[in-house]
From Swiss-Prot:
Pathway: Carbohydrate biosynthesis; gluconeogenesis; Carbohydrate degradation; glycolysis; D-glyceraldehyde 3-phosphate and glycerone phosphate from D-glucose: step 2/4. It is found in: Cytoplasm. PROSITE patterns: P_GLUCOSE_ISOMERASE_1, P_GLUCOSE_ISOMERASE_2, P_GLUCOSE_ISOMERASE_3. InterPro entries: G6P_Isomerase, G6P_Isomerase_C, Phosphoglucose_isomerase_CS, SIS_dom_sf, SIS_PGI_1, SIS_PGI_2. It comes from Neisseria gonorrhoeae (strain ATCC 700825 / FA 1090). Belongs to the GPI family. GO terms for cellular component: cytosol. It is an enzyme of class 5 (isomerase). GO terms for molecular function: carbohydrate derivative binding; glucose-6-phosphate isomerase activity; monosaccharide binding. Its EC number is 5.3.1.9. Catalyzes the reversible isomerization of glucose-6-phosphate to fructose-6-phosphate. PANTHER family: GLUCOSE-6-PHOSPHATE ISOMERASE. This is Glucose-6-phosphate isomerase 1.
Amino acid sequence: MKHLHDLPAWSKLWNHFDDSKTLHMREMFEQDPQRAERYWLQVGGLTLDYSKNRINDETMSLLFELAREAGVPERMRQMFHGEKINTTENRAVLHVALRNRTNSPIMVDGEDVMPKVNRVLQRMGEFAHEVRSGSWLGYTNQVITDVVNIGIGGSDLGPLTMCTALKPFGHPRLNMHFVSNVDGSQLRDVLSKVHPETTLFIIASKTFTTQETLTNALTAREWFLNHAGDEEAVAKHFAAVSTNRKAVAEFGIDIANMFEFWDWVGGRYSLWSAIGLPIMLYLGEENFIEMLNGAHLMDQHFINTPLERNLPVILALIGIWYINYYGGGSHVIAPYDQHLHRLPKFIQQLDMESNGKQVTLDGKAVGHETSPIIWGETGINGQHAFFQLLHQGTHITPIDLIASLEKRSNLPGHHEILLANVFAQAEAFMCGKTPDEVRAELKAQGMDEARIEELVPHKTFSGNRPTNLILMDKVNPRNMGSLIAMYEHKTFVQGIIWGINSFDQWGVELGKQLAKTILGELTGETEPQKHDSSTERLINLYLQTNRK
């Protein structure tokens, strides 16, 4: 395989970095009146302004050269054609098949997967229609008013993010709840708000053996049976998203209400599959299809557009520029829409679980940085929390500022204030404020010269802080589909360049394996095992505390 450090463009970019690292965006804008127009892209309902980055035409040309040398176009083609690019698990990676709206054949091991995809999608639609229309009744013949999704990781974050983001499109009768944490308090809080006669539980676990999910599911089942009293009633109030028919049936769920997905669908890429059942229940089949349409639009743009005008590719390459050359170890997601407040967490899992890898596809140490730490908060809240560090801290931290052009509420003045802040922050991060500008400002306030000089260093902003401004014409299912697909493909491209497998997650497994051993010790079911001295003391502390 090709190793990043051996690619000619990698070295060329280091030389270019040494020559260009002192350039300031403020000067680049002054010298180039066409800069904003040139570094601007529109795809469907999304607009990307990437002009406020530490790049010029030479930077982008070399980054595109790097992408080609790393085999990005070929790897993209392999994914869309169902080749097994998840090499450590010997699996195809085909979340794009789930939103293949042309219905053209996509082959895995000689079989077209589209008939299966369409069949599950049709069954989801029929089930959602029954629940939403009120024809699906609980064990006391009442309509469903609450849906509780029990899952973890991709079985939780994707549906939660979409249902929250698209709340204005949700069914007015349905209240959506999501349980992922096994600590007990989250499930207890949800159960205290719902009624067994009118609640539908969705248990989302591919194997139906995930410890956290099954623990919560069994507790929910016990709570339900304490009220219903009849195990046959479980079938009216529980559905499953799984592939384990036997375990689902043993749980008491009617197999007719089990919705499958496949091993070529990774958890963090699965909201388009049956894992998205809560989304379809809440938004309806038509809006779910619109979400798929938006993702398909981005897929087609991604696979058919030259790298130089390819939105996910450009975002990926700009990220590589900061991570691997500037040493930018984190990236902020700042949506300026309260309904998008779950988006940073979703992208955190997508990026960090995909690209938080230390070896290349052939098992060698990567020798360079991979995934940045992804973090964030709604933009307005972030301005009053961590934007101080972004403006005047010592780190270089790229920021995605995400907003909607169309108002989401009818409250006068609110959206204008919001967008004014988005645009102002992007400008402030880029321009900063020079010492001379600070002096002039303080002098106009009548401050004496000695005091001015004391304050100048504190009120100076270096600027040159990079941002991507991502605008949706409106927040709707179609644009949300495009937005999520954009980030999926960005993550994939970065993984290609780093030479890693973006579609496994072995780092999730080790702690889970050790937890099984320790659980037996905490419950007294197994004899104490050999651990390091710290872990042994922690186990003993727990046992002593709970003997009291």
